[in-house]
Structures are given as structure tokens and as C-alpha cells.
């Protein structure tokens, strides 16, 4: 009976050791993924900045991702160009207002 307990304890130790190495590998992969996401986050376009060349590159706001909003601008020579900026759409502003109001009321 003692031999069985020793063998079981040895197996449990080996399994826990091997799984901890697997977890370390997993943590290293997650760390690399987080670093890549952080790099992407740094490259996003902040609110009120121009996004004409990268319409899907706006950063995230408090609750929602900013949207690239475009307008047509008439230049001095009479031509028209499209200018875009990252901003919060009206329905997102309304949702943020409701959530902020709810937080003030309900704490």
C-alpha cells in the first residue's frame, strides 16, 4: 500500500510540474500577444485626429470605438475633397450620457 501511495505522489508531482511548464509557455504566448495588442493600440488614431487614409484605425473611447466620420470640404479653387476625423457618433454619445447618468444615480 505504501508503494502505491509513493507512486501516486510521484505521478501527481510529475503531472503538476509538466503542466506548470505548459502554463509558463502559455503565459509567454499571452505576453507576446498582449505586447502586439499594445503596439496596435499605440498606432490607433485618437479622437479628433484625421483618419482619411485609415478609416478603420480609430482608437477606443470609454465605452465604444470611435468612428471615422467624413465630410466633403470645398477648397478655395472650387474643388471638393473628403476630410475625415475620428469621433463619437450621436447614438454612442447618447448611450454614454445615459450610462453616466445611471452611474450618478445608482452610484
From Swiss-Prot:
Disulfide bonds join 44-59, 51-68, 58-86, 70-84. It comes from the Eukaryota. Residues 21-41 form a propeptide. The keyword Metal-binding does not apply. PROSITE patterns: SPIDER_CSTX. Residues 1-20 form the signal peptide. It is found in: Secreted. The keyword Transferase does not apply. Expressed by the venom gland. Keywords: Disulfide bond, Knottin, Secreted, Signal, Toxin. GO terms for molecular function: toxin activity. GO terms for cellular component: extracellular region. InterPro entries: Spider_toxin_CSTX_knottin, Spider_toxin_CSTX_Knottin_CS. Belongs to the neurotoxin 19 (CSTX) family. 04 (U1-Lctx) subfamily. The presence of a 'disulfide through disulfide knot' structurally defines this protein as a knottin. This is U1-lycotoxin-Ls1w.
Amino acid at each position: 500500500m505504501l508503494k502505491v501511495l509513493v507512486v501516486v505522489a510521484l505521478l501527481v508531482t510529475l503531472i503538476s510540474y509538466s503542466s506548470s511548464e505548459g502554463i509558463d509557455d502559455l503565459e509567454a504566448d499571452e505576453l507576446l500577444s498582449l505586447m502586439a495588442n499594445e503596439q496596435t493600440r499605440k498606432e490607433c488614431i485618437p479622437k479628433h485626429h484625421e483618419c482619411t487614409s485609415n478609416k478603420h484605425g480609430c482608437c477606443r473611447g470609454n465605452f465604444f470605438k470611435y468612428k471615422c466620420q467624413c465630410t466633403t470640404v470645398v477648397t478655395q479653387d472650387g474643388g471638393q475633397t473628403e476630410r475625415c476625423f475620428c469621433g463619437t457618433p450621436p447614438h454612442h454619445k447618447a448611450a454614454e450620457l445615459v450610462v453616466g447618468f445611471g452611474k450618478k444615480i445608482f452610484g
